[in-house]
C-alpha cells in the first residue's frame, strides 16, 4: 500500500477532476447545490494529503514546513480562499445566499483538510 500511495493519490485527483468536469458541464452544481459540499471536502482532503505525500518524499520540505508561511494549515486556508476568489472572478453565478454558500465552502474545505492534517501530521512532521 505504501509503495503505491502516489498512484492511488494521483488516481483520486484524476477521479475528482473527471467528476468535477462532468458536474460542471452538466450544470449539476446549480441543480443539486449540495454537490459543492463533498467536492470541497474531498479536494481539501486530497490537497493536504498530497502536501504530506511530498513532505514525506523530500527531506528539505520538512524544514520548510516548520516556517509559518509554509505551515500546511496556513497554506490550506490560503488555497481555499484563493479558490473562492477564483470562482467569483470566473463569473460563477451568484445565488441569493452567496455569502452562506462561500462560508459553507470554507468551513467544509477546512474540515476536509484538517482531517487529513491530523491523520498524516503525526506520521510525517513528527518523524
Predicted regions and their residues:
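Bulky hydrophobic segments
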Residues: 1-127
Amino acid at each position: 500500500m505504501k509503495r503505491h500511495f502516489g498512484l492511488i493519490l494521483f488516481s483520486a485527483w484524476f477521479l475528482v477532476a473527471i467528476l468535477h468536469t462532468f458536474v460542471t458541464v452538466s450544470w449539476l452544481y446549480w441543480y443539486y447545490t449540495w454537490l459543492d459540499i463533498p467536492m470541497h471536502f474531498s479536494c481539501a482532503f486530497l490537497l493536504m494529503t498530497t502536501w504530506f505525500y511530498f513532505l514525506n518524499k523530500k527531506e528539505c520540505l520538512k524544514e520548510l514546513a516548520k516556517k509559518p508561511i509554509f505551515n500546511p494549515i496556513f497554506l490550506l486556508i490560503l488555497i481555499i480562499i484563493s479558490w473562492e476568489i477564483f470562482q467569483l472572478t470566473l463569473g460563477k453565478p451568484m445565488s441569493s445566499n452567496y455569502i452562506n454558500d462561500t462560508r459553507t465552502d470554507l468551513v467544509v474545505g477546512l474540515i476536509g483538510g484538517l482531517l487529513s492534517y491530523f491523520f498524516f501530521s503525526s506520521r510525517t512532521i513528527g518523524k
